Amino acid sequence: MTTETTGAVSAAVSGQDTLQKFIFDNAAVRGQFIDVSHTWQEVVSRHAYPTAVKKVLGEMVAAAALLSANLKFNGSIIMQIHGDGPVRLMVVECDSDLRLRATAKLDPDATIPDVATVPQLLNATGKGRFIIIYSTAHYPPIAPATCRVRQPWDWRLSCLRRCR
């Protein structure tokens, strides 16, 4: 998406997706409208998700795009829900250029009704987790090990001393 600014309103466009920012001059109010229909159709065309899963995943896509649009960073926002219901995992990633991707992993044996709620989908036994990862482009995802292993039994101790 690219951003164009005109006065108190700016818009971002990617294909047919739009992000519209607005500010009221006489009030301390600002906001955004987002339409990610084009990207969303791409996501759901690749998987046969149940209606309830599409709804929650769509809300996550919109939330990730809005969050990324409001932060000034070079990297990506990753939103993950690890569920203990019929939906095991939902992941949405939006980078600083507002490029999106999303997926869900479902329990293959579960039957999901069209009107299932978020707790029914993702938090059936109270062990669901929601995680937001703020990843900058310049931070390496894995730090290289700088310690040497002399003996099989002392590698942990050696790494603890030298890699702190």
Please report, for each region that a protein language model flagged, where it lies by residue.
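Intrinsically disordered, low-complexity regions enriched in acidic/Ser/Thr/Pro/Gln residues
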Residues: 115-164
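N-terminal functional module of multi-domain proteins
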Residues: 14-135
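N-terminal low-complexity or simple alpha-helical regulatory segments
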Residues: 2-20
